[in-house]
Regions:
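Cleavable N-terminal export/targeting peptides
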Residues: 1-27
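Outer membrane beta-barrel
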Residues: 23-45, 49-168, 178-180, 187-194, ...
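Transmembrane beta-strands of outer-membrane beta-barrel pores
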Residues: 40-46, 59-61, 78-84, 104, ...
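Transmembrane beta-barrel architecture of outer-membrane proteins
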Residues: 58, 80, 94-96, 145, ...
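Detector for outer-membrane/organellar transmembrane beta-barrel domains
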Residues: 177, 187-275
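Outer-membrane beta-barrel "beta-signal"
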Residues: 186-188, 292, 316-328
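Outer membrane beta-barrel transmembrane domains
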Residues: 251-301, 305
Length: 328
């Protein structure tokens, strides 16, 4: 375990060392900016969920980003939000990002507590994290940040590849056992506005009695002007490190601009598990809404949601939400 941790630490140090080799006595002036994001909502259920209502502070990000003109960037972000480890009304603060990124020509190297690449493209295309997480994040296929290193290279204007090596336990847990997660992705942009991506990863088990987790996903998205449409397919084997606990699902989402400050959007998710091992969580989810941009920093988004469980004895649930996003 110590050897693996030393390897990650050594790789994480590569970025500043390489960047230092490119500097000179007349280094350009650096620039910094604050990172602030607050996601909140008010919601109510209908029918059997009528008592589920109220205001929620879903998440807040506080951080700072410092960029040098030689391609070196430092970033630290704290995440304050809900956690399964505490009561629903309590919040826990985590360090989500603490990394160094170095960019040189077509190469990008990041080390530290970095953003993962498993569903970063999908999350960017969806563009409404404050309303609902992207599919893999929502259904726990992986974490959005982790401790490790990543490298991306643009071979051509329309083709790039990336690799990542992280602990595999996410940013909310400290690595205490052996096991790393390896991932690689390919991104194609053959036409203006069209993005195609394939990604696969393997997360080693920390114990011989457990199974390693394999993830792979395919994504296609098209965006031009005020219109975007995307679809993704996701598959995971040995979920929670348990043999044959496989699950998969797809997500389709679209946004249409109807003015400078208004967007209409919709999304449909489908989640299923092998041999119904996770039937209680299997089902279909749908959300439709309108996003109103109030100036540069604030978004208000009324939306309706439905969850249709796969289990025969489970009832559908309906909700109305008003989500708010404040970002700088």
């Amino acid at each position: 375990m110590m050897k693996k941790h030393r390897m990650i630490a050594a790789l994480a140090c590569c970025a500043p060392l390489l960047a230092g080799a490119q500097t000179n006595d007349n280094e350009p002036k650096a620039e910094g900016k604050a990172i602030i994001a607050i996601f909140s909502d008010v919601h109510t259920g209908f029918g059997s969920n009528n008592n589920d209502r109220g205001f929620t502070l879903d998440r807040s990000y506080l951080g700072y980003q410092y960029t040098l003109k030689n391609g070196l960037q430092f970033k630290a972000v704290m995440d304050v939000g809900q956690s399964d480890d505490v009561h629903d009304y309590e919040r826990i603060a985590y360090i989500k990002n603490a990394l160094v990124t170095w960019k040189y020509k077509n190469l990008t190297l990041s080390g530290g507590l970095i953003s993962t690449t498993q569903f970063k493209t999908q999350e960017s295309f969806w563009g409404k994290r404050y309303v609902m997480k992207s599919f893999q994040d929502e259904y726990k296929f992986g974490s959005s940040a982790d401790m490790g290193v990543s490298l991306a290279y643009d071979f051509t204007p329309w083709f790039s590849a990336d690799v990542i090596l992280v602990n595999g336990e996410g940013y909310k847990k400290v690595q205490v056992n052996d096991g790393l997660q390896y991932g690689a992705g390919l991104t194609f942009t053959p036409l203006r506005g069209l993005t195609l991506r394939a990604y696969a990863s393997y997360n080693e088990a920390s114990d011989k009695t457990l199974e390693g987790i394999t993830n792979w996903n395919l994504f296609a998205g098209y965006a031009t002007g005020a219109f975007s449409l995307a679809a993704e397919y996701n598959s995971q084997t040995n979920a929670r490190n348990i043999k044959d606990h496989d699950q998969s699902g797809c997500s389709v989402y679209s946004t249409v601009g109807v003015g400078k400050h208004v967007n209409l959007f919709g999304r449909w998710d489908y989640l299923t598990s092998k041999d119904h091992w996770n039937e209680a969580a299997d089902g279909m989810a749908g959300v439709v809404g309108a996003e109103f941009k109030l100036g540069k920093y604030i978004k208000l988004t009324p939306n309706m949601r439905v969850w249709s469980p796969k289990a025969d004895d489970a009832k559908k649930s309906y909700y109305a939400y008003l989500n708010c996003s404040f970002t700088i």
